[in-house]
Amino acid sequence: MTVLTDKIAVVTGAGSGIGEAIATLLHEEGAKVVLAGRNKDKLQNVANQLAQDSVKVVPTDVTKKEEVDELIKMAQQTFGGLDIVINSAGQMLSSKITDYQVDEWDSMIDVNIKGTLYTAKAALPTMLEQSSGHLINIASISGFEVTKSSTIYSATKAAVHTITQGLEKELAKTGVKVTSISPGMVDTAITATYNPTDRKKLEPQDIAEAVLYALTQPKHVNVNEITVRPV
C-alpha cells in the first residue's frame, strides 16, 4: 500500500513546475488529487497522465477568494473530504523597487501572499472541524536571502514564511499541521530567464520529495519548516 492511499489533496499551481511535480508524486503515493491553476489546458495535460478516477481539474485563480472557496468545496464534493492542501501557486516578476513596476508588485502580492491566505481561509475550517489535515506553503530561499533584483519577490516569500509561522502557533494542539518549504533555485520555466549560467538548480521533484517527507511523519510530529538547497 502506498503511503497516502485515499488521502485527498489539493495542489495549487499544479499545471507545471513544482506544483505539477508535487501533484504527480502525491498521486503516485495513492492520494486523490485536485489540480488547481489558471491554465485549464496545462492542468488537463497533467491530469491525462494520472488515473482519471482519482484526479480532478479545477481551474482556479488564487487571487480570487470566491474561486478558492469553490476549489475547496469541489474537492470535498468530488472525493468526500480534505486532508492535504499545497499552496504551490507563485509568481516571480521584476522585483527591483527602483524599476517602479507597481503593477508587477501588485501581481506578486496578490498571488504569493493573498493566494496563500485565501487558500488557508478556505481549507482550515474543515481541517479544524475534523481535527486533522496538513497545509503546506511553498516559500523560497529568497525570503531569507535578498538580492538587488529580488526585493519585492523576496518580501512576498518572507511573508509566506511568516504566515506559516503564525499558523503553526494558531493551530498548535488542534491536530492540524502546517509546514513551510523554502527551495533554492528550481529548474522551471519561471526561473529560466532569471538564473545565472553558473548557478546550480534543484529539480521540481526535489521539492515534491520534501513535501512527501513532511506529509509522512508520525501523527504526533509536525515538520514546521524545510529548506532545500542544491549541493
From Swiss-Prot:
NADP(+) binds at residues 10-34. CDD domains: SDR_c. Pfam families: adh_short. InterPro entries: NAD(P)-bd_dom_sf, SDR_fam. Its EC number is 1.-.-.-. The keyword Nucleotidyltransferase does not apply. Keywords: Oxidoreductase. The active site is at residue 153. The keyword Transferase does not apply. This is Uncharacterized oxidoreductase SAR2567. It comes from Staphylococcus aureus (strain MRSA252). The lineage of its organism: Bacteria, Bacillati, Bacillota, Bacilli, Bacillales.
